[in-house]
Amino acid sequence: MFNLLTEGGVFAKDMLFATLDTTHRVLRLPSGQPAILSDTVGFISDLPTDLIDAFRATLEEVKEADLLIHVRDISDPLTERRREEVMQVLDQIKAGPEHGQDIIEVWNKIDLLGDVQMDKIEERAQASIELEDMMSAFPISCHAKTGLARLAQGIEDQLTAGDEILHVDVPPQQYDVRAWLHKNGHVIKETTKRNGTCEMDVRLSESDAGKLRARHKDLVS
């Protein structure tokens, strides 16, 4: 999934310890906005004691994420048990929904399901998206390369929830503001007038929109 979404070349195989280190790639969201996608170590039941600390160290990065994406093998008969194990580990490192962190689930390997199972999975996934108090789930098949566009849109919807689109007029003498907007926001439209004023429509997170208004409220309309 990581490689398909980012067109990366990360080693991927269904085997123990296939991914040990955290890998980062740029994910281009449907709107064109970039996001950093990190591939962390997988979760393993009954991990040997001497490896627990090493795995925990790599998972510490999880706490810094704006959004967690839990990839599940939905064809695994023990998939619900695996899910509970993951949630327990997240809670132990003070990450996940119990600690105010957004998370979505990706239900991979739907190509291995029968028609009846698939119908039930689709119904559950749709309900999860429509109900705000449920964790959103996105059925995909990396093997068949299906469901990825819907997943990418779901990721963007989660990341941009609460964002604001502001119109900002930046005069020539304050082009440091323009640089800040490019660094911290997603510039949707930008034009420069004859007097040098830069007119910008930019998407900002709620916190960054607040910072902009606090520092330069005269530029925001």
PLM regions with names:
Residues 14, 48-49, 77-80, 142-145:
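Ordered, soluble secondary-structure elements with a strong preference for glycine-centered loop motifs
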Residues 23, 49-62, 71-98:
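Conserved catalytic-core segment of NTP-binding enzymes
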Residues 40, 74, 109:
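Walker B catalytic acidic pair
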Residues 37, 71, 106:
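Generic enzyme active-site microenvironment
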Residues 1-68:
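Conserved G1/Walker A P-loop phosphate-binding module
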Residues 2-7, 77, 88-221:
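C-terminal-of-GTPase-core extension/linker across diverse P-loop GTPases
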